A protein has these predicted regions:
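Transmembrane helix-loop junctions in multi-pass membrane proteins
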Residues: 76-86, 149-153, 212-221, 249-251, ...
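Membrane-interfacial loop-to-helix junctions in multi-pass transporters
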Residues: 2-14, 46-52, 132-138, 193-199, ...
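Alpha-helical transmembrane segments of multipass membrane proteins
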Residues: 19-20, 62, 73, 77-81, ...
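Long, contiguous bundles of hydrophobic transmembrane helices that form the permeation core
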Residues: 91-195, 298-389, 422-427
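Hydrophobic transmembrane alpha-helices
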Residues: 17-21, 60-67, 99, 209, ...
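Hydrophobic alpha-helical transmembrane segments in multi-pass membrane proteins
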Residues: 10, 14, 18, 64-73, ...
Length: 430
């Protein structure tokens, strides 16, 4: 209802819906298939090219695996691996995930502006009551969050309380006059059990893989090889690790991706002094990027089959829309302020400048901000965005990079807004 009132509403609705569903689905491809059959035709109907409609769906669905509090169930395993509270994992993953979706929303908005796509017609917008009718189901989610972060309960105990709250609200309020029968409740429990069994099997199989890797020494050898080839350079090691993560992550569900990479790649990053939580989030991000990175971008290709677009064109468009996921992990590795490690003031500044950087780079990629951007202006937007993205604590003097990037970005934005207003006035005068 709210998104549809603005330009590019269909694409923004797809981003929101796929992100929410993807955070609990545990599979980017399953999320694309589940939500894409609705969102992709809706986006195409608004006038977007088929490959862009498929790409935005693939990127939004993949990002759901990185969005707290569930993160495709990988957050729970990460807490076990690192022996730290689950709430710490969720807090650390929150800002990077928000920046990911902010970049996606901005690109959706600017693409709509560049292509002249208007808001959805009022006749197609749902009535406000349609949204309000099911709002009581949010209570169960609120109970879950309260139990996890306020009461500090273990995830399994908090999930049980959330399930009880969901059943209670269903029985008391129902939905559109319908309340679940006892048979329907038992059927839901059975379906949930089947889903849990899949997760247990994946975790058990992953445990066997880790055991074999440790017994054979392959885990140690890969860690040693990465560190040696990297030659002590963190930048080279991060680049090599990203490639390994993308290759190993191809075709695996989220849990499988994380467990494999946490055992094989993360130790090499920790060995050179990278924060353990930053290292584990780094491998998770690049493992999930295998879903939108050609040549085997399974989520992008699944979306392409629904949109009937060219698979490779969809894959490259998905990489463009999902650019932030290739950059943000590198930033929080060099400066953990983006994962809320550091002084409150430094964290605040890092978040603000990163948000500005995301906006500028998204505008450069879209080629639009208030008006069409020339190639040189796009280059300047991108350069200022990169400078603003660098966290102040990344290296000595990085604060000047932030200041130059933000100041230059604000100046470019102001100039483009003024240019657009002058052009509009000239047209009106003519």
């Amino acid at each position: 209802l709210g998104m549809g009132r603005f330009r590019g509403g269909s694409m923004k609705i797809a981003v929101l819906a796929s992100g929410l569903f993807g955070s609990v689905s545990g599979s980017a491809v399953a999320n694309v298939v589940g939500t894409g059959v609705i969102t992709i035709p809706m986006i195409k109907r608004d006038g977007y090219p088929a490959h862009k409609a498929a790409a935005i769906e693939a990127v939004a669905s993949t990002g759901g695996q990185l969005m707290p509090p569930v993160m495709g169930a990988s957050a729970f395993l990460m807490a076990e691996f690192l022996a730290i509270p689950y709430s710490t994992i969720v807090a650390a993953a929150l800002v990077p995930a928000i920046l990911y979706y902010v970049a996606l929303f901005i690109q959706a908005d600017l693409e709509a502006a560049r292509m002249g796509i208007k808001a959805m017609p009022k006749s197609e917008l749902p009535a406000g009551r349609t949204v309000i009718v099911g709002s009581h189901f949010v209570a169960a989610f609120a109970v879950l969050i309260y139990a996890l972060f306020v009461l500090r309960w273990q995830p399994e105990r908090a999930a049980l309380l959330g399930a009880v709250a969901l059943i209670a609200t269903s029985l008391v309020f129902g939905y559109q006059g319908n309340r679940p029968s006892l048979k329907a409740l038992f059927s839901s429990l059975s379906t949930t059990g089947h889903s849990v069994v899949e997760i247990i099997l994946i975790s058990a199989a992953s445990g066997l893989v880790i055991g074999v890797l440790n017994v054979t020494g392959l885990s140690f050898n890969l860690t040693y090889a990465l560190v040696e080839v990297g030659g002590g350079s963190a930048i080279v090691l991060l680049f090599l690790s990203a490639i390994v993560c993308i290759i190993l992550g191809m075709g695996l569900p989220t849990l499988g991706v994380y467990v494999l990479l946490a055992a094989l790649v993360a130790p090499a990053l920790v060995k050179v002094g990278i924060e353990p939580i930053a290292a584990h989030l780094y491998v998770l991000y690049f493992g999930m990027m295998s879903m939108i990175t050609p040549p085997i971008a399974l989520a992008a290709f699944a979306a392409a089959s629904i949109a009937r677009s060219a698979p490779m064109a969809t894959g490259w468009a998905a990489m463009k829309f999902g650019w932030s996921a290739y950059v943000i992990p590198v930033l929080f590795v060099f400066s953990p302020t983006l994962i809320l490690i550091g002084e409150p003031f430094e964290i605040t500044i890092a978040i603000i400048t990163a948000g500005m950087g995301v906006w500028l780079i998204s505008a450069a990629l879209a080629g639009y901000f208030s008006t069409q951007l020339t190639p040189m202006t796009r280059l300047l937007f991108g350069l200022c965005g990169l400078l603003a993205l660098v966290p102040a604590g990344a290296f000595e003097g990085a604060v000047w990079s932030d200041l130059i990037g933000v100041a230059g970005g604000v100046a470019l934005m102001a100039l483009n807004v003024m240019r657009n207003r002058l052009a509009v006035r000239s047209e009106e005068a003519a």
